């Protein structure tokens, strides 16, 4: 009976370790992982770039990232790599995308949004987009001059 209990305890610890490790496929989290488990952490991250945002996301999506990000997500993957975000480590994983309205994009009154992709409680990707007449997609850094 003790052996069975010990085996069950070991199995439980291994299962918990697997669940807590998330979907990093054996890769360690980056040294500068950005916490984003709460609304406050996500908002603080965007405000840290100089963005003024609406307090609540306008959209929250739960999605499954493709196993292969090099095809249709290639440009987005490059953008995230240039920002030092671990998007590529999360291929095939589940993530949430939080979309916020940006209120202070230079030269554009409305229609600009920030997206944050979050997995395992950290930011794995982010971008700023406008789909209006002046459509664009860029990294999270506040532009030095008007968009």
Q: What do these predicted ranges mean?
A:
Residues 1, 109-112:
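Short, small/polar residue-rich loop motifs at catalytic or cofactor-binding pockets
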Residues 5-21:
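Hydrophobic membrane-insertion alpha-helices, especially the h-region
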Residues 18-33:
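Sec-dependent signal peptide cleavage junction
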Residues 29, 35, 61-62, 145:
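Mobile, glycine- and charge-enriched loop segments
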Residues 29-34, 102-105, 113-114, 128-130:
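Second-shell loop/turn segments in exported
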Residues 38, 42-45:
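Stable alpha-helical elements in mature extracytoplasmic
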Residues 48-109:
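Mature extracytoplasmic domains of secretory-pathway proteins
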Residues 111-147:
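A short, surface-exposed interaction/processing loop segment used at functional sites
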């Amino acid at each position: 009976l003790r052996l069975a209990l010990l085996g069950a305890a070991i199995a439980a610890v291994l299962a918990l370790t697997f669940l807590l490790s998330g979907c990093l496929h054996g890769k360690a989290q980056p040294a500068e992982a950005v916490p984003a488990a709460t609304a406050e952490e996500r908002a603080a991250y965007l405000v840290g770039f100089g963005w003024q945002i609406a307090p609540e996301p306008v959209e929250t999506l739960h999605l499954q990232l493709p196993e292969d990000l090099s095809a249709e997500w290639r440009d987005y993957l490059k953008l995230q790599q240039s920002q030092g975000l671990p998007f590529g480590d999360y291929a095939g994983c589940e993530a949430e995308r939080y979309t916020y309205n940006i209120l202070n994009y230079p030269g554009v009154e409305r229609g600009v949004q920030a997206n944050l992709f979050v997995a395992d409680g950290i930011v794995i990707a982010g971008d700023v987009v406008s789909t209006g007449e002046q459509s664009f997609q860029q990294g999270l850094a506040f532009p030095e001059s008007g968009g």
